[in-house]
Structures are given as C-alpha cells and as structure tokens.
Amino acid sequence: MIFRHDGDNDFTDLFCGLGGSTRGLIEAGLRPRLVMNHDPIQVATHRLNHPDCEHLVEDINAFDKRSLPRTRILWGSPICTEISPAGGRKRTRGQIALLDQDGQPIEGDAQPEFQRTRATALDIIAATEVHRYDAVLCENVPEFFLDWELFDWWLGGFKILGYNHQIVCASSAHLGDGDNETAPQHRNRGYVVFTREGIPLPDLEVRPAAECPGCGPVRARQVWRNPRRRKMGSWGVQYDYRCPTDSCGLILEPTTRPIGDVIDWSAAGQRIGDGRPDRKKFTPYATSTRERVAAGLARFGHEPHVTMLRRNTTAVSVAGPVPAVSAQGKHHALIVPNGRKGAVRTTLEPLTTVACKPHHSLVRPAPEVDDCTLRMLSPRELASAQRFPADYILPAASQEAQILGVGNAVSVNAARWLGERVKAVLA
C-alpha cells in the first residue's frame, strides 16, 4: 500500500529502533526527515525500510540538540527498560498502585533508579526547547507515568515552554479504525501529546469497535474505575469499555484481531516428548512447561494453543467474555507467562505484550503432553503481532537482534492512530 504524506508535516523520530513509530507516522501521512538510535543494527535495518530520511547512530544524551533539523513534529519514546513490567521490578515509593490484568500487584526484582529513563526523557525537553516543535508525541509503559517521581515536573517543563498536553492510555489491540488494523496483541501503553499554545489538542478519545447485545455495533467509551487517579493502567483492571448509549452503558469487549491470524500454521514444531531442540543431548522440557501444556489440554481440548513463557496472570476462559480477552478467529492457543504462574488464552484472542526475549511458543495438542508439538513463535510472527507489514525487513544479524527490535518497537497501528489525530490539528 502506498501512503501519501503531506510534505509540510515532517517529523524527527528519536529512539527510532526498528521503526514501528516511523512506519505508523508514515501511514498517517507524515514525512520522516531524521531518525536516531544508539543501536547500529536497528538503524541499519531502519534504513533498509525507510531509505528516504536521514539516519544517525548516536547516543541522544551526548548529542547536540541544535544539530537536529527543525521539523513540525517530534516523536520520542524514552528508554523504559528500567521500569517495564517485562523486566520485573518492585514498585517504588510514591506511586499509584498498578495491577496486572488479573488484578494482582506487579512485582519482581527491585531496580534502583530511573537513571536512563530520566535522562532520555529530559532529552526530549532539551530538543523541544531548541526547536519548538508544533507537536511532540511520547510513548512509554504505564510505570513511566505512574512511578517516576519527576513526571509531573517533566510535564511542567513543557508547560513553561508554552505547550498544552493530553495523556491517553490504551492497548494496541484496541487502537485502529478503517484500514488501520489493530495489533493482535494486548500491549498497554501510555501516550502523551504536547501541542504548542494556539494549536488545538487532538481528539485522543479511545473508541474501539464493539458489539453491544442490545444496541448492536457501537464505538465503545473508555470508562475509568477510579477517575480520581491518573488515568493509566490496564484494560479490565483500571478501566473498561462501555456502550455509549446513555440508556444502556453495558461493559463491552472491543472487537480485536486474533493472534491466530498471523501465525504460520505450516511451520512444524518439535514433539515435546523428544526433548528440547536447542540442546545437543536429550534434555526434557521443564516440569513447569509440561504442566502449562497439560493445563491447556485440560481447558481447550485438542485445539492448537500458544504458551507464553513469561509473567504471571490467571487463566482466561474461552467460554465467555472475561477481562483482557476477546473471542474471534478459527484457532485456539495457550498463552502462559514466564515465571511462577501461568495463564491460558486462545488464538481467539490477541497476544499478550511482545517483549525483547522469546516468550511465546506454539503448541499443537495431542492426547498426551509428550505427543504435542511445540515451537517458539518466530520473529516474523512477533513482528506481525506488532502490526508491522509482512514485507517489513527485519535485522539480518541474528534472531536475538530481530526479537530485540520487535519487542522494543512501538506498535505500528498505535503510532498511526496518534499521527492521524495530530495531523488533523496541524492542518
């Protein structure tokens, strides 16, 4: 598909990585002028996909912001590895409680400070002070908005520079409309859009398509369970979607894309009873992995399912609507987080968050665990879960570099959703 862009609406993409944000903004009709990242592998791959803009391999902390070009828009996603729930860390003092989709506190090993997060966030202010962009767009994990003690001070810095701001939180599975397909992945992220005084704030109301049993097809409204707290968190825990009809107001599940749509069902897996294929001599799968596969068999019979070897959530049933899942598609999957606890989901649902390490494995069931086949989802499948197009070039260096780039990327549909709305107020 060819996307037409307005030559006047150009943008700079700091921390561009593999290019999810760049691709999304291009789809929104914006033009990239310069992109930057510290990782030469990701920048080289970005250049292959987007050859018509300038590429820099630089550490933004040490880069003279005066050397950046003057563009109308700046996109910046501050480094979030210190605070991402995928890294697993204990919460810091002074925060608002954040729960996972099961309502359980996010816990893990403590990380001492927000050092890199703070530094890269301040780089965005520094660039804005020099170039006075018409709009600045930032994306990060909810913890950036909830846990960082300087977050309100950071917002205040933009206010001093003459900017208004608007914050929105949503899952990548719920952002999209028209030909902007949603991502088949539950990826909760916060976004903040700054516009210069005199430029209207964009309409960032999240209104995903849903089916109301009484009212039919609707655009659901995002409703926060505790409106007195900062509107940031996870769907089904901190907020819901309701029917917009005043006389109805039912809690609805947005229409989503199933992960089964992007799985290569022709790729063969390894029989579990034959042991792990990544070992030279026979090594059985861990007991916890076998137990998760058995749980999937018990819940979903003999349909294919995906095991997610990562974080803790609780079991999700395919029998009816439950928080953080949706039901559509032709296949089933078991998705179980890596760690102490696991959860089961189906390919009727979107994938959970794609991280920077391989966590998702496809299981083809059989009557016994040993006879099931298992394989990790490929980088291409994970890229599709981030809504990259099928022909998007991935790093050639290694599978690890591919997964790193995909896991760090902004979901393409989310960047496009924001870009379209910002473009509307800059017209």
Feature names for model-found ranges:
Residues 1-427:
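Conserved active-site and SAM-binding loop architecture
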